[in-house]
Amino acid sequence: MKKQRIVVKIGSSSLADSHGGISKEQLSDHVAALARLKEEGHEVLLITSGAVAAGFSALGYPSRPVTIKGKQAAAAVGQSLLMQAYTEEFRKYGIVTAQLLLTRSDFSRKEQYSNAYATLGELLNRSALPIINENDSISLEELTFGDNDMLSALVSGLVSADMLMIFTDVNGLYDKNPQKNEDAKKYYFLPEVTEEIASLAGDAGSKLGTGGMKSKIDAAKTALSLGVSVFIGTGRGQEKFVDVLKGKGDGTYVGNAPQKEMKMNKQWIALHSVVSGQIEIDAGATTAIIQHGKSLLPAGVTNVSGFFKVGDVVEVMTQQGRVIGKGQCTYSAEELREIKGMQSQHIQARGERHNYEVIHRDHWVSL
């Protein structure tokens, strides 16, 4: 089996016991299986939930708190307990772990996004196993975000993973809720996530988790768009993750391999960047960009909206108002208003620029 880069996401329901604490038995089972992946020569990253579930009983809550301050306090206590438990278990296999706590803003800010990429790359090069969680104690997103499902998809794209394994307490995707319908049909393989499939998923999560099947399907769709195939399911024992790679996992495989990888810069533009303005373009420029993969030139620009700087991300729309994509602009809004509609030779005569693309195709994402 060739060396692969694998992201494994383990949800709260797969970690916590019935009283809300960390189940040592379940955690040990997961760690043993992750260690087997490493033993097989694969690079492994772990996205783990469970900080709130691990911490609420230590603070005296009889059950998972429902207030934001209660959840965040529980997460602050639980994250250290969770990491300590992982570190002790992985040490038995001689595996060095590293903790990364991320928030949505770490993805939306280009410099922090690049730093996360560089840090993860160095950790993997050093054979460490990164353990990643949302920074629950200061971030609201995780508490309504889907139990780290989307975080796992975004990280898998960031590191160009070969596969994302989302482990939960349900053995895959069904056309109906299998707990309520005996005739529910299981999907063993889905080539893509269609609107029909997405509509079948419910929002309800498990008792100790926040992410239902809908969040997992949304995460799978995002991962596929970033070139990462997905497995959603469950399992026990040391071989469960290796079995997934062999096609023997107890769940649903999503996506045909190999997927087309999206470069890091385009991932940031597509999924994380903040749009600072809009550019309207004519029909000729639309055809050149969409059908022929060309860069956007000033000659095709008909209107500029907003106030943006060089390097900011802008939306691009047709004269009919349809948004076709977005990208990093090489001109400020003020500069672009002065040269919109001008041919490159006329801009050259002004002597102001040596590169004349408004948005280079390497910094463009179609929507």
Swiss-Prot record:
It catalyses: L-glutamate + ATP = L-glutamyl 5-phosphate + ADP. Its main location: cytoplasm. GO terms for cellular component: cytosol. Pathway: Amino-acid biosynthesis; L-proline biosynthesis; L-glutamate 5-semialdehyde from L-glutamate: step 1/2. Its EC number is 2.7.2.11. This is Glutamate 5-kinase. Signal peptide: none annotated. Residues 276-350 form the PUA domain. It is an enzyme of class 2 (transferase). Belongs to the glutamate 5-kinase family. ATP binds at residues 9, 168-169, 210-216. CDD domains: AAK_G5K_ProB, PUA_G5K.
